[in-house]
Design a protein with these regions (language model features):
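Hydrophobic h-region of N-terminal signal peptides that target proteins for export
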Residues: 9-18
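N-terminal mature-domain "stem" immediately C-terminal to a signal peptide or N-terminal signal-anchor/transmembrane
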Residues: 19-78, 109, 215
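Catalytic zinc-binding patch centered on the HExxH motif and its immediate surroundings
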Residues: 70-99, 111
Length: 295
């Protein structure tokens, strides 16, 4: 009987803590609405809001837009599908939401203005998933191979040759040429990197530049608008996957400068990243079918 009583007390205490957290989060979620009114005009993608799943131990506290779309309300609790790292900042489909994509964060993200910008970074990924990501991804040979092998974490675990000395030198060099306005030389270096990497590694590079680079591109647009320091981390040696956040962002800015309005169509943006000449990038990368836009 004592064990049952103790268990009941623990359960009640946990429930009370969860209720306190939900209550404290409610006004913080509403600030997302206010920020969107400020940053939404920067790009059509930022005009979309998505569910927010806050990690509380081994469960999600899921908030979604109310019926009026003018505020967030608590929707439900759900078990986390896998252990969540401390300070998680992510976006992925949730079974509890019938596979709708959600921003997944830990509670301290709401403690700073930059944290709210991070939420919108993750909303960009939600928009990618909601529009063209599944179709684009399905045309990548590296994705098909990963699915055949049951490797669902391939985007994080892909064995990209970051340590290759030529790549580590030329990738930042191409970005530097873009920044200096020397587009032809930047694209020559880029073409050399494509040959160096081979088809599969090049697919991975382009995928990460499109997915994470575009989110970083809009993240920095928001930070500039809010008079906050931009995020340009990722190119310090040794290079890691985060290099493609910064590299992708700068490459996208370069491409947008050559083709105004390019970022308004996510599929075309991917095509240009894969082949800046505007020609077909090869069957393994170039998507087919309709071209959903970000609107």
């Amino acid at each position: 009987m004592r064990k049952i009583t103790t268990a009941a007390v623990i359960a009640l205490a946990a429930s009370a803590v969860a209720e306190d957290l939900k209550e404290s989060l409610a006004p913080k979620l509403q600030r997302i609405i206010g920020l969107q009114a400020d940053v939404g005009p920067l790009h059509p993608v930022l005009q979309n809001l998505y569910p927010v799943a806050v990690v509380d131990g081994d469960r999600f506290l899921i908030f979604d837009l109310d019926e009026s779309k003018t505020g967030y309300r608590f929707l439900k609790e759900a078990p986390v599908p896998m252990p969540m790292p401390k300070g998680v900042r992510a976006a992925f489909p949730l079974e509890a939401l019938d596979n709708r994509s959600a921003c997944v964060v830990s509670p301290e993200v709401f403690d700073s203005a930059r944290g709210y910008v991070t939420i919108f970074h993750e909303f960009v990924h939600c928009r990618q998933w909601e529009t063209v990501e599944p179709a684009l991804k399905g045309r990548l040979s590296i994705y098909r191979q990963a699915m055949e092998a049951g490797d669902y974490m391939w985007e994080l675990s892909y064995p990209f040759p970051y340590e290759n000395a030529e790549f580590a030198e030329d990738y930042p060099a191409a970005l530097d040429r873009m920044d200096r306005g020397d587009g032809p030389e930047a694209l020559r270096i880029r073409a050399r990197l494509k040959d160096l990497l081979g088809p599969e590694n090049y697919e991975y590079l382009c995928w990460q530049e499109w997915k994470e680079g575009f989110a970083r591109y809009l993240e920095n647009a928001m930070l500039r608008h809010l008079d906050m320091e931009e995020n340009h981390g990722g190119l310090a040696l040794p290079l890691t996957r985060v290099a493609f956040y910064e590299g992708g962002s700068r490459f996208i800015a370069f491409l947008e400068g050559r083709e105004n309005g390019l970022t308004l169509n996510l599929e075309t943006l991917f095509e240009r990243i894969a082949d800046p000449s505007g020609e077909a990038a090869g069957n393994s990368i170039r998507p087919t079918g309709p071209s959903p836009t970000t609107h």
